[in-house]
């Protein structure tokens, strides 16, 4: 099968890659580009572990073809921290112990980042709704919601 050449922007950097027409963006990110933060939990878009932001829209990268990233902006968990400085969401997830095994954590962080970009002062209900596409089998959701609430407060003051 002939490869597809793709030029895109990932976490602010121009990136070019060659992928197969049927290869998912998740597989491209992980296997071709070494960006292993997004995880494959289900492969059907049900769990949110592979969440990324594509042109300011939260998507499951397991449902997007790698070729569809042509000319678009991709944001992954790897782009959240700046050097050793964690994003406020990452910091608050640590402080609130809002993670355990870590499989779901990158997806939750990206979904929360997307939510707060669109709604910087969400209610608890809005946070729960905004994160409803992400599943956690270990920690539960209360610590995650509290971490997002706390991060929203910090980010408003920044």
State where each predicted segment sits:
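Signature of N-terminal electron-transfer/Fe-S-associated modules in redox systems
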Residues: 1-158
